[in-house]
Amino acid sequence: MIQKISSILLLLLLLLVSNNGFAQINQSILMLGGQEIIGVPLDQSPEEIVLKTTKKNGKVKILLIDISRVFSVTQNGQEEVWYNPDSSETGYSIKEMRYYIKGQQDGRNEHKTTLPVITSFLVSGALAALTGSQELAVVVLSPIPGTLIGSLTKGNMPSNEKANGGEPMSQAAYIAGYKQSARMKKIFHSILGSVAGTVAGGIIGLSIASSNS
């Protein structure tokens, strides 16, 4: 009887160890947008992957990843490309899509948004100060013009060194990816600049209105 119980306990222990070992195998998922997501796969269907990720603070988060947005999955140093050129709207080959993804990553990491932020801050700040000084309710709409003008500032292209290297089609894919990412970054930072400008300008405008009353 004791021997039988010991065998069962040993079997359960082996199952537990093997399950834990499997669960700790991380996958690195490269998205078509250039994001890299690292986590433990929990489940997978034809449409999505259920991934468990752990943040730097130790907090665990469960993500549902759309498989159609995945370029490749790397596990144990081996990359498996999931991207299918035939089902892609871009028409990029696997090699060209790599350049497109690299462009998105560089645009997100390297593109400077100083001018859009300053422009959106000044435009929204000036409008907020003006409308706030007159105690007009439209002061809350001040971020909109600043965001629009900041987003329209020029400069979504990569550096000449990166834009002019490589084969023509790969070069075009890289530039397209960079411009897409740079545009989104510029819009987001313009929104932040406009909101900050509205707050600063609104405080100044309301202070002026208060001193005049």
Language model segments and positions:
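N-terminal signal peptide c-region/cleavage motif recognized by signal peptidases
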Residues: S18-N20
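Surface-exposed short loop/turn segments
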Residues: G58, S211-N212
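Final/C-terminal transmembrane alpha-helix of multipass membrane proteins
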Residues: F188-I208
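Short, solvent-exposed mixed-charge patches
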Residues: Q24, N212-S213
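Bacterial N-terminal signal peptides that target proteins for export
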Residues: M1-L9
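N- or domain-start disorder-to-order transition segments that initiate the globular core
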Residues: L13-L14
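Compositionally biased alpha-helical segments
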Residues: F22-F188
